[in-house]
């Protein structure tokens, strides 16, 4: 398991430390993050708490900035967990400090965006499944991120996956890397694993969402300051890649 950059996971310690939120409300928030209820009635049924209390506690969370409501025409209340502005500002400050330690950068941005868009908490990063083996070398091939319970893998395809760069010592080495990518996709298909390739141009929240296969459930997103900052980091990386295209700069990216 790796560090998660999901907003609600990062914000949870602040909620638990808050003296203004009841124990019941804190428990409901955790449950909301886990099950993404379709309505207050659904949340009441799942929690075993009466609908009257659920509404009261959820309204308290909303008033403190921990939830947002979207009331549909059917009068169902769609609940989206988030975090107050002050908490998000603290998380953005922390995020801006820690992102400078990321490497490879493009792959790390992809993973942070998936944390905030895919509603599957368990995944493996940089894993080498025993059944995805290069038949020539006998070595296992690596997925950047693998949602093993749903059979979906994500691969960040840096420029070195598409053309020869300074990272390749020869044309033969570049061709070998391309062959490993093709073998990985072929073996994955044989084992019913869908491999999604992400490029630098995809590192926007809205673009990432369009790349997520139907077999993966989506997370409800509240586009507050933290998610906007994450999206901004993706835009900065896209700009950096465009600016340095053609230069002899060692690009970062996923490992084969």
Residue ranges and their predicted role:
Residues 63, 80, 206-208:
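Short Asp/Glu-rich motifs
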Residues 62-72:
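A short, conserved structural fragment
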Residues 19, 39, 71-93:
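Short, cationic-aromatic polyanion-contact patches
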Residues 35-50, 61:
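A short alpha-helical element within helix-turn-helix/winged-helix DNA-binding domains
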Residues 1-42:
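Short recognition helix of helix-turn-helix/winged-helix DNA-binding domains
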Residues 87-256:
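Nucleic-acid endo/exonuclease domains
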Residues 55-59:
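Short, hydrophobic-biased segments on the C-terminal half of alpha helices
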